Curated annotation (Swiss-Prot):
One of its GO terms (cellular component) is cytosol. GO terms for molecular function: ATP binding; DNA binding; DNA topoisomerase type II (double strand cut, ATP-hydrolyzing) activity. One of its GO terms (biological process) is DNA topological change. This is Type 2 DNA topoisomerase 6 subunit B. NCBIfam families: PRK04184.1 (NF003218), top6b (TIGR01052). It comes from Pyrobaculum aerophilum (strain ATCC 51768 / DSM 7523 / JCM 9630 / CIP 104966 / NBRC 100827 / IM2). Its EC number is 5.6.2.2. Relaxes both positive and negative superturns and exhibits a strong decatenase activity.
Length: 527
């Protein structure tokens, strides 16, 4: 006979840590940096604080492959009595609300702790203080995987003399720095693109980054909302009914769902064949299933609210891409809110051109979900499909070209293609919005390139004519006895009038993409 037993949730995740991105020492180190950075960003920008984040990786034992990771932020901090559960209890989080978060399950920090203690048997060190707190709390914590509860190895309190607020975390883990280094660098730089209001300082064994704050403008913070009628399942509905005893169906719909007023609720119940005055607790199991089916089918609901979401915004995308990619020009678009299955989402796209972007046979793609850079599984992402199928020739782009594409999806529920959460699935509504966003951004690029072509034509015409100015001025000077320099200056002015732009204006707009050498332009320019 088989012996049956229940596996505690913390132990299950410890055994299946690859589901949270902790596949091996390389991915684990990258994932640790990612989890700590994203928690720091959520603890700052969501509360109107400009993020300042310090990160450090040290080699602790080269023979064992042990490294330490330290992260510190200036966020709102964690109340002292909550620190043990936040770091030591799986599925304990402040993120179980209907609004946009970087994290989804409240699992990331706990997976860092589980991986750390599984590979080094060392606790996580946490120090935190909330806004205006008189005390700083410090803990050393491990997780009891059998009871899914924190093990507090040490607890201390310090007076907060300088009114510091934020959270500092230090963990020891098995990690491959050399293999993870490039991914970590890419991740932090891509984070700086979509969050140019953050200052991120990173120090590794042989890598230092100082990603400066480029703007003080923060994106709007997402608001917490009620579920949309199309987004619930039977179990969710049953839980909501248990908390709504005594309500009629009409009252239940109005109080528990987003954008459902009395008129909308009455129209739906009449269409679905339900008595609006029936007690919601009196619904039979069959009626519950019918109610959910009808809620999904009904087309009279309003769209989900967009203030649950926090897109980066075209301005911040342009600032970030120019700063980090060194692009000559960036054109960004934020689409209007749409929904899939009752879940609101917004797609943003940006195209970056020229500058320090190297020419390639296809666009460099930078993918984001809820402001999180996605670095793995690019081939499985619907964004890669959209970019590859896009007809770039219609927008004056000829490959190889110095082109980068940024696609960001923000939603209360990102439809990931796999448990690794590194690629967005092919949801028709999201794919359509990606295509439209990319088209809108590419139209702006086409206008820009068309103008550059015309300016290049004029610059080449100027250079062709200007090559003869010195000789003509010399000959005219011999005939008229007028100074050659004065004649040359007048001839250059005549050419500029004919073209309609000064040489300084032409060079400013076109030199960076011109096939004409800088020496040619300098030679043809009046000194």
């Amino acid at each position: 006979m088989y012996a049956y037993e229940a596996l505690p949730v913390a132990e299950w995740f410890r055994r299946n840590r690859e589901l949270a991105g902790f596949h091996n020492p390389t991915r684990a180190l990258y994932q640790t940096i990612r989890e700590l950075t994203e928690n720091s960003l959520d603890a700052t920008e969501t509360y109107g604080i400009l993020p300042t984040i310090y990160l450090r990786v040290n080699i602790e034992d080269e023979q064992k492959g042990w490294v330490s990771v330290y992260a510190e932020d200036n966020g709102i901090g964690i109340p002292g009595n909550e620190i043990p559960n936040v770091f030591g209890r799986v599925f304990y989080s402040s993120k179980y609300k209907i609004k946009q978060h970087r994290g989804v399950f409240g699992l990331g920090l706990k997976m860092v702790v589980l991986y750390s203690q599984s590979t080094t048997n060392k606790p996580v060190l946490v120090r935190s203080a909330t806004l205006k707190s008189d005390k700083i709390y410090e803990y050393q914590i491990m997780i009891d995987t059998n009871s899914n509860s924190p093990i507090i190895l040490d607890r201390r309190e310090y007076p907060n003399r300088y009114k510091w607020h934020g959270t500092a975390v230090k963990v020891y883990l098995e990690g491959n720095w050399l293999a993870a280094k490039k991914r970590i660098e890419d991740y932090l730089k891509r984070t700086a693109i979509i969050a140019p209001y953050a200052e991120i300082v990173f120090k590794g064994p042989d890598l230092e980054l100082w990603l400066k704050r480029r703007t003080t403008k923060l994106p709007p913070a997402p608001k917490e909302g009620l579920p949309h009628p199309k987004s619930v399942d039977v179990d969710t509905l049953k839980q909501m009914i248990q908390e709504s005893r005594g309500l009629t169906l009409l009252e239940f719909l109005m109080e528990n769902f987003d954008a459902v007023g009395e008129g909308t609720a009455k129209a739906f119940l009449e269409w679905a064949g339900f008595n609006p005055n029936a007690k919601v607790t009196a619904l039979t199991p069959e009626e519950l299933v019918k109610l959910v089916d009808k809620m999904k089918q009904y087309e009279g609901w309003r769209r989900p609210r967009s203030d649950w979401l926090s897109p980066a915004g075209a301005e911040l995308l342009e600032i970030g891409a120019k700063a980090i990619l060194g692009a000559e020009a960036v054109f960004a678009i934020t689409r209007k809110p749409e929904s899939y299955g009752g879940h609101p989402f917004i797609v943003e796209a940006a195209v970056a051109w020229g500058g320090q972007i190297p020419p390639a046979d296809k666009p460099l793609l930078l993918r984001y979900a809820n402001k999180i850079p996605l670095l793995y599984d690019e081939g499985a992402d619907v964004a890669r499909k959209v970019v590859d199928e896009f007809n770039w020739q219609n927008y004056k782009v000829k490959f190889p070209a110095p082109l980068a594409v940024i696609i960001h999806v923000c939603s209360t529920k990102i439809p990931y293609a796999s448990a690794g959460k590194e690629a967005i699935a092919e949801v028709p509504e999201i794919e359509k919005e990606m295509k439209l966003a990319l088209r809108d951004a590419a139209k702006k690029l086409r206008l820009y390139l068309s103008r550059k072509e015309k300016e290049m034509e004029m610059l080449n015409k100027y250079i062709s004519l200007a090559k003869y100015v010195e000789e003509i001025a010399y000959n005219l000077s011999m005939i008229t006895r007028i100074e050659k320099e004065s004649l040359a200056k007048n001839l250059h002015t005549l050419i500029e009038r004919k073209i309609g732009l000064t040489i300084e204006e032409l060079v400013k707009h076109t030199l960076s993409m011109s096939s004409t050498s800088q020496e040619e332009v300098v030679e043809a320019t009046p000194q």
